[in-house]
């Protein structure tokens, strides 16, 4: 694994050359990344089709479009973000210059995820490059076709010493984590997030951890159930449920459970036809291990829709479970698959209590026509982010930082927040060497008596 040490050393030496300090250089590299994407859309969608069964349109909409938007925003706004930020002066510093200067951290490690292997690897990179860092990318080996593609394309378009790709599995990642970085960005499971954080602690390296959890979705009786169920079905079953901010389960009053089931079924038919297996818009589970895990969560449950599978193609039908026991296995772990449990609660207060008795999720969703219900849900729970009357879309807005809290992660990125995450905000005070008389009082010897105010 000596090559990994050599790779990190190469990135460090390139960073130390100082070339990334130039704003013009950073923008040139971001524009090169833009070209890389636009000139290789077919290859990107092909890799996503091989890894996750996505079609060309889905690949672009779910993965590529948000990265291109992030690049557009960053290239346009970077000169303003990088400006020194003046701060308020005290009585003693009226003649001084006080400001915060954003400087690059150094060498950043980005460990990508397999479920959105393009977006969740490249989007963090945008912020790291914008902030002036060298970047080492570690794509997930689980989505191997995308890992191969990124390793091929990035050196063709970007500086070959500053922006490097390391392929491989657990051994390579383990060796990478022994190296000293200036920031580590990891997207994935909470269990591995703890390993990353422990490794980073040995070097006092700061981390951004975008993890997961069971993101709840509360459906109030006072809402348009047709619209609510259509939006929930879209967010839950896109990418075959393999989305870190997908609604994991529904909380609702028992009186509307059957209506929700029927309206979800209608939406699924509208989206994927009578047989989702034949739909070009419905994905597949990433590998056999995850297929067996998700399939096992359906066992001994009351299936209201779906529940079928085909192991040969790693297909699991869109599945709805009703009257789910909160203690059952499907409610003990993040599902990360096309299985939607419905848990009945008899009030908003009971729903809030249910959510607060569990780990803080990455996202929380609430559907209601009543603004007081929405405000109460937000005020009395905690999650990485919230969307009311829709799902997932809060993470697509560049001006809203995306990140977790507690077990669902720490730190955030997207838009300006990415630039800030990968920058050191350096406090600066510049004083004149003149007017020394005004500073006499601070020097020894001190007076025998305290001055009166």
Swiss-Prot record:
InterPro entries named among the record's database cross-references: Ald_DH/histidinol_DH, Ald_DH_C, Ald_DH_CS_CYS, Ald_DH_CS_GLU, Ald_DH_N, Aldehyde_DH_dom, Aldehyde_DH_NAD(P)
Name of the featured protein: Aldehyde dehydrogenase, dimeric NADP-preferring
Catalytic activity as recorded in UniProt: an aldehyde + NAD(+) + H2O = a carboxylate + NADH + 2 H(+); octanal + NAD(+) + H2O = octanoate + NADH + 2 H(+)
Binding residue positions for NAD(+): 188-193
Any Pfam family hit: Aldedh
Organism placement in taxonomy: Eukaryota, Metazoa, Chordata, Craniata, Vertebrata
EC number: 1.2.1.5
Assigned GO CC terms: cytoplasm; cytosol; membrane
Function comment: ALDHs play a major role in the detoxification of alcohol-derived acetaldehyde. They are involved in the metabolism of corticosteroids, biogenic amines, neurotransmitters, and lipid peroxidation. Oxidizes medium and long chain aldehydes into non-toxic fatty acids. Preferentially oxidizes aromatic aldehyde substrates. Comprises about 50 percent of corneal epithelial soluble proteins. May play a role in preventing corneal damage caused by ultraviolet light.
Subcellular location: Cytoplasm
Chief place where the protein resides: cytoplasm
Native species: Rattus norvegicus (Rat)
Top-level taxon of the source organism: Eukaryota
């Amino acid at each position: 694994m000596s090559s990994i040490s050599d790779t990190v050393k190469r990135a460090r030496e390139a960073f130390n050359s100082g070339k990334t300090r130039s704003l013009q250089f950073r923008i040139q590299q971001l524009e090169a990344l833009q070209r890389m994407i636009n000139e290789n859309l077919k290859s990107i969608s092909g890799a996503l089709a091989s890894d996750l069964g996505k079609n060309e349109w889905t690949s672009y909409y779910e993965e590529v479009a948000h990265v291109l938007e992030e690049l557009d925003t960053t290239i346009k706004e970077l000169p303003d973000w990088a400006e020194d930020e003046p701060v308020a002066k005290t009585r003693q510093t009226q003649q001084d210059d006080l400001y915060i200067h954003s400087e690059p951290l150094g060498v950043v490690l980005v460990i990508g995820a397999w479920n959105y292997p393009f977006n969740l690897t490249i989007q963090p990179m945008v912020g790291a490059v914008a902030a002036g860092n060298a970047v080492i990318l570690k794509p997930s080996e689980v989505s191997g076709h995308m890992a191969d593609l990124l390793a091929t394309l990035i050196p063709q378009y970007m500086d070959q010493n500053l922006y490097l790709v390391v392929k491989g599995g657990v051994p390579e990642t383990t060796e990478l984590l022994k190296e000293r970085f200036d920031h580590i960005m990891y997207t994935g499971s909470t269990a591995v997030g703890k390993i990353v954080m422990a490794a980073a602690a040995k070097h006092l390296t700061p981390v951004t951890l975008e993890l997961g959890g069971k993101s709840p979705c509360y459906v109030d009786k006072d809402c348009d159930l047709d619209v609510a169920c259509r939006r929930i079905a879209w967010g839950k079953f896109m990418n075959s449920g393999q989305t870190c901010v997908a609604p994991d389960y529904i909380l609702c009053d028992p009186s509307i459970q059957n209506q929700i089931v029927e309206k979800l079924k209608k939406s699924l038919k509208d989206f994927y036809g009578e047989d989702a297996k034949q739909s070009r818009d419905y994905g597949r589970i990433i590998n056999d291990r995850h297929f067996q895990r998700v399939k096992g969560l359906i066992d001994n449950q009351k299936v209201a829709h779906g529940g079928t599978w085909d192991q040969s193609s790693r297909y699991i039908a869109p599945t709805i479970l009703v009257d789910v026991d909160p203690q059952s296995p499907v409610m003990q772990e993040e599902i990360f698959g096309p299985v939607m449990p419905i848990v009945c609660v008899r009030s908003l207060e009971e729903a809030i209590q249910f959510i607060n008795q569990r780990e803080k999720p990455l996202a929380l969703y609430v559907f209601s026509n009543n603004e007081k219900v929405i405000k109460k849900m937000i005020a009395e729970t905690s999650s990485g982010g919230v969307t009311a009357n829709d799902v997932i879309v809060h993470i697509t807005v560049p001006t809203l930082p995306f990140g977790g809290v507690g077990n669902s992660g720490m730190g955030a990125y997207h838009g300006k927040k990415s630039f800030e995450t990968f920058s050191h905000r350096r406090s600066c005070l510049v004083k004149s060497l003149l007017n020394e008389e005004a500073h006499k009082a601070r020097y020894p010897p001190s007076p025998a008596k305290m001055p009166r105010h």
